[in-house]
Amino acid sequence: MMTAPKITFIGAGSTIFVKNILGDVFHREALKSAHVALMDIDETRLEESHIVVRKLMDSAGASGRITCHTNQKAALQDADFVVVAFQIGGYEPCTVTDFEVCKRHGLEQTIADTLGPGGIMRALRTIPHLWRICEDMTEVCPKATMLNYVNPMAMNTWAMYARYPHIKQVGLCHSVQGTAEELARDLNIDPTSLRYRCAGINHMAFYLELERKTADGTYVNLYPELLAAYDAGQAPKPNIHGNERCQNIVRYEMFKKLGYFVTESSEHFAEYTPWFIKPGREDLIARYKVPLDEYPKRCVEQLANWHKELEEYKTAERIDIKPSREYASTIMNALWTGEPSVIYGNVRNEGLIDNLPQGSCVEVACLVDANGIQPTKVGTIPSHLAAMMQTNINVQTLLTEAILTENRDRVYHAAMMDPHTAAVLGIEEIYALVDDLIAAHGDWLPAWLRR
């Protein structure tokens, strides 16, 4: 083994995300001298990231080197870790297209990056590019581990392990650890006092056990306290990011009905189910505080904030940041040093969750050490939770089959099975919507879709 790893970042123009991941990396002793290869097709964004990463490295006392690439294969050459974070088609034009076309057909969305027509189109745009990374990794860094942050996570991860089973990869999200911190904040307790066991699928995993440590060192079930706080109007607390549109009512109401708390946000969860967004039901939107068109609004705000932050970073002498909640540096450190850690990752269901389809993509706790990323067996999850997840897995199954077999019919079938879409549109309307989305996206989609 070399004395320091090579970390390749595909999509390095995502400057703020790069900053968070590499800020963590540079504060790990075993990774301080890593070779960081930044790759992006946008040379301007790439150079901006280079400036930020150099200042991060210097501020942390890291001694590695940085190289910048617009050629993917060159960036991947001899990599040990490959971090992937990009959005094919960006906010403009593709995200705008997903929202505007669906709205014309009477389908409202909130985020549209995981399921539904928005998630389906994003998967069709994205998976061919992920496959190209797998091709290049096979050729120039076959032993590397891919840390994938690209949505729609389940469909992307599934499509990669189906076609490139030899590539070591894990799909990463921050909803498990992020929601745990949110719930601790809602109850005014220290997040480090929590202990939990979580399982499911990406953006629809549930805390099967959620406990807090008491003064005498024993653990107690946190769910009764959480429910009491919600009923008393003491939870949820205002959005930590100051976003007044996202009030987290949907998840708490689902918690009351299901008995378990889901990991992904209310604005996400509202569009994974058939109950919250319906034409002419403004009462539901008002009652559950569902933020329609949230993702486009967020993109505009984040872009403005990013430009402001970037200017500050470019003029700053040093950049000091707090550790993030992302798992990437934890995984790299554990694989590189052998120091064991536990993370939550999206992986192939091979006997992990008994009552979800084998081969589907599930989110479970994984032990990480010198032996690799080792998912842990969960067993059987509560039947009502599995039933809800299955409605989402249906879409993932059909879309993955569509792109693996180049079968346009399965794209329609995936949209038909989407819980939210099916609750709003008839069959012919769904077909017309898919046709319009494919036409509107044009060359952003694979050529076989337009044959």
UniProtKB/Swiss-Prot annotation:
Keyword NAD applies: yes
Cofactor mode of binding and number, as noted: Binds 1 Mn(2+) ion per subunit. Binds 1 NAD(+) per subunit.
One cellular component (GO) term of this entry: cytosol
Binding site for Mn(2+): C173, H203
InterPro entries (alphabetical): GH4_Enzyme_sf (IPR053715), GlycHydrolase_4_CS (IPR019802), Glyco_hydro_4 (IPR001088), Glyco_hydro_4_C (IPR022616), Lactate_DH/Glyco_Ohase_4_C (IPR015955), NAD(P)-bd_dom_sf (IPR036291)
Pfam family, one: Glyco_hydro_4C
E.C. number: 3.2.1.22
Highest taxon, organism lineage: Bacteria
Keywords for this protein: Carbohydrate metabolism, Glycosidase, Hydrolase, Manganese, Metal-binding, NAD
Active-site residues (renumbered): H174 (proton donor)
Enzyme class: hydrolase
GO biological process: carbohydrate metabolic process
Quaternary structure and partners: Homodimer.
NCBIfam families per the UniProt record, alphabetical: PRK15076.1
Family: Belongs to the glycosyl hydrolase 4 family.
Name of the protein described by the UniProt record: Alpha-galactosidase
Native source species: Salmonella typhimurium (strain LT2 / SGSC1412 / ATCC 700720)
Gene expressing this chain: melA
